[in-house]
Amino acid sequence: MYRVAVLYEHEPDAEAYAEHAELCSQVPGGVFRHGKVTGSPMGDPAHAYYAEWEFADEQAFRSAIRSDEFMATGKDAYKRGFPPPTVEFLELS
């Protein structure tokens, strides 16, 4: 299983992010989820908001991150003025 994790230090505007999430859900081959970070085991969490795409396998992941739809999500987030996120790619066993 592969994931793209998107971590925001500050929570984006809820209405604008709901519109952005619709675009994110169009990335082929994956499932998109997002929500507030609610805590951490040691003090305040480092991030306020989390989003992810989940892909069943490497082929679906590689295809998705090269897709026009995936590229459009980054452009849309920038145009909306969302706080710059940390984006990481994960392989899970």
State where each predicted segment sits.
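Short S/T/G/P-rich N-terminal loop/turn motif that feeds into the first structured element of a domain
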Residues: 1-66, 88-93
